[in-house]
């Protein structure tokens, strides 16, 4: 089980790698999405705001009504954010759940894949 602090650190690192990745920036260039990241086993929830493809700093807690929600155990989420596990396989196995429009989910999948492959 990852702590809230470990999950926050992993998420910050993930967002930094995403912003530095050219393929991610191209994929997200016109994407606006308010995303909630929620751990199901510890009290850890974060808001990620993407405006015009730019990843804003991660915020503690949940803000406003999200376009996309990502839920999973703290360990599964941290392993994905650190790049230790393939996000697609975790999603297919049901370890991670997403809720939102198909377009937002597909963009998140593309972003996760590009970051994972670039590690």
Specify the residue positions occupied by each region the protein language model found:
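Feature captures hydrophobic
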Residues: 1-119
